[in-house]
């Protein structure tokens, strides 16, 4: 009898999908929308999904950065590969900090994958946890937050493209899918493949089974940011549109 009970418990356990470590690191229930530590120009705990003005863009489209002491050579190579995507396709330039007052400190010894949105002034941290965040796609995603971008699936027009199944969302975390009612249009249509789009099971009560984000187009399969290795052209276009004036100042 005892053996039968143990086998039954084991069968249930094996049938329960395991949340990938990369998803656990990205979907932090303690952070705004899972991976946003704060928003430039807004009080902690009172975030709205929008940067309020160009004052919170990086001057000249240049983002100085340093690596924290925890970042090893392999992690640096992954993060630098993510930065190269910006350099190859946008006017944004990540440069090693010298004496700049505003800069990113990129660390791998904090908890989870997260960033502030926009420049908050002074040193601002960007976390790419060793356990779950060392992916090129994740690095690009968090760096896009740092220069001022939000999640694609929270755009104000998202209901034309996806259905949010709130009945499948973990209790208390429906706010992670709040639409950006202050969304700033920067010239591109909704893109399911955006590096800023979450996957099908974001904040799901039952990973791998209970879908939370379902495309209205049945032919679309949502891919997690950490499973992508580049930004979409629409992402690059939005960056160049948002930073057109800032980057022009650099020339």
Which residues are covered by each model-predicted region?
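Zinc-dependent metalloendopeptidases
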Residues: 4, 11-251
């Amino acid at each position: 009898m005892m053996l039968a009970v143990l086998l039954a418990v084991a069968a249930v356990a094996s049938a329960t999908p395991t949340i990938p470590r990369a998803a656990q690191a990205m979907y932090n229930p303690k952070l705004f929308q899972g991976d946003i530590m704060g928003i430039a120009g807004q009080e902690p705990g009172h975030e709205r999904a929008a940067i309020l003005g160009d004052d919170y863009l990086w001057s000249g489209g240049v983002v100085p950065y340093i690596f924290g002491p925890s970042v090893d050579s392999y992690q640096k190579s992954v993060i630098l590969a993510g930065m190269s995507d910006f350099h190859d396709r946008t006017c944004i330039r990540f440069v090693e900090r010298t004496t700049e007052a505003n800069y990113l400190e990129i660390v791998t010894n904090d908890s989870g994958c997260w960033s502030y949105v926009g420049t908050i002034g002074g040193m601002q941290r960007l976390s790419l946890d060793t356990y779950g965040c060392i992916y090129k796609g994740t690095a690009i995603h968090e760096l896009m937050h740092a220069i001022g971008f939000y999640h694609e699936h929270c755009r104000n027009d998202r209901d034309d493209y996806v259905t949010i199944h709130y009945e499948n969302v973990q209790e208390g975390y429906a706010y992670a899918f709040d639409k950006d009612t202050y969304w700033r249009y920067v010239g591109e249509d909704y893109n399911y493949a955006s590096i800023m789009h979450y996957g099908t099971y974001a904040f799901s009560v039952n990973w791998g089974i209970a879908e939370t984000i379902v495309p209205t187009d049945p032919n679309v399969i949502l891919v997690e940011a950490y499973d992508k290795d580049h930004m979409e052209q629409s992402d690059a276009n939005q960056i160049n549109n948002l930073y057109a004036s800032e980057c022009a100042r650099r020339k």
